[in-house]
Amino acid sequence: MNPKIRKPNNSSSKKVTVSVLSVFLVFVFVNTFFYPSFYSDSGSIRRNLVDSRESFHFPGNFRKTKVYMYELPTNFTYGVIEQHGGEKSDDVTGLKYPGHQHMHEWYLYSDLTRPEVKRVGSPIVRVFDPAEADLFYVSAFSSLSLIVDSGRPGFGYSDEEMQESLVSWLESQEWWRRNNGRDHVIVAGDPNALKRVMDRVKNAVLLVTDFDRLRADQGSLVKDVIIPYSHRIDAYEGELGVKQRTNLLFFMGNRYRKDGGKVRDLLFKLLEKEEDVVIKRGTQSRENMRAVKQGMHTSKFCLHLAGDTSSACRLFDAIASLCVPVIVSDGIELPFEDVIDYRKFSIFLRRDAALKPGFVVKKLRKVKPGKILKYQKVMKEVRRYFDYTHLNGSVNEIWRQVTKKIPLIKLMINREKRMIKRDGSDPQCSCLCSNQTGIIHGV
């Protein structure tokens, strides 16, 4: 016997259908008369989403940032190179920029002087009409100027005079005055570069290696860009692993430094007697550079200690050498941390922990060869970011970082124009203060 099949309640079904239809008609009525733009714009919104995805995946499609590079008087660029050489030249533009750890100013300048067809993958495009520019680049060789001044005392060259002259020239420019320099980009790689005039250029996006010599109202992670030193030794191209690396740890540099660099002398005393640790004094010279290359290429770990400032080119030499950096520098700032996680190829040690007898070598001896190999593989992937000669290296990444500042630049320009000037006795800066909790994440 078949069970009885219940017939649907037709009146209930009709009521549900009528209710759904009524809600739909009300929705259409409201959106048609009160929110018509939703429908008219939906196609463009959808297209914009597709366009943005395509731009993200295909770099050639996005709008490049337009950068105007000032045609500075030659005494701020090639004239500084001429002063470094000490001999007059009929054509200063033919002079070669001398090699040193702050060559970023040269690479950025030369990048903008290259034909556009050779700047493949760059997020910026150079424009020659300042009215078209999103940003303005000031190409003064401020770090080289310091070298010339300190290297030839009594020669008659003054870096401070160069700084004053540069800023006076800038302040006479219409485009600088328009927004108080906020849409300008200035490289000041050496910690003392532009120190005398920093208060007059602090509104600009500063390209710096650290913030150690800058006040909180002069430099910040929000406004400025941390850039890498130019590494001085050849990259390691040999076999990965520890087979060719007979030293546990390597360091070569000045033993005695001021302020935060005092940790060097203490660590020298702790480490110099360890049998497979190479730690010795040395200043910059061709002979010592060869010794550094040999030491870094044959060591598993390379020690990075704070000097007069927390940063140094030694870290980037280590990465180029695939020598695992051991960083003992509590306040160090590192470049490009939005795309690079340094913990994946570096070991960070707190200063107080590193100064405990036996702590450093004991910790490093526990790192297995397989772990070192993983560190090396990551370094090999990321080291292009620290190579100014790489087609998609430091230069492109610096421009990308600068481009990301544009929304903040526009915000600050508009905000400044409508706000009453505040009392200068309480300076404020749009500053990102990292790790406000005070929690220490190093070992």
Swiss-Prot record:
Protein name: Probable arabinosyltransferase ARAD2
GO cellular component: Golgi apparatus; Golgi membrane
Membrane-spanning residues: 16-36
InterPro entries: Exostosin, Exostosin_GT47
Localization annotation: Golgi apparatus membrane
Superkingdom field: Eukaryota
Source organism (scientific name): Arabidopsis thaliana (Mouse-ear cress)
GO molecular function: glycosyltransferase activity
Gene: ARAD2
